[in-house]
Amino acid sequence: MSMKIFDIAGSALSAQSVRLNTVASNLANADSVSGDPNAVYKARMPVFQAIADAQNPAGSGVQVRGVVESQAEAQKRYEPGNPLSDKDGYVYAPNVNIVEEMVNMISASRSYQSSVEVMNTAKDMAMRTLNLGK
């Protein structure tokens, strides 16, 4: 059994950790506002890319290519009493969709959990292989 499986599963753990951190950042900033639509927090999303390996056509893991900001417009709300409002009384809220972020959080958590199970299964198989000679 190839020990490459631990590298592959480890790359998935790392990628899903970035995804969870991004979700946490989006949720933490979901209620922040600004008087300037260009200064308001924008939802972020990680971009994943397969790691190419000519020696292993079955796959070699995943890497985070980067984190991109959503291009959706900020939400404009009329709040003239808000100290952060612009001269017309508007504040701008992030383009964070709470429901979508919760779905992303659950999905990332499940993917992370699956990768941990892959590592545990590979470890158990390796231990059983070592015990064959006893």
Sequence positions of predicted segments:
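Amphipathic alpha-helical polymerization modules
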Residues: M1-K134
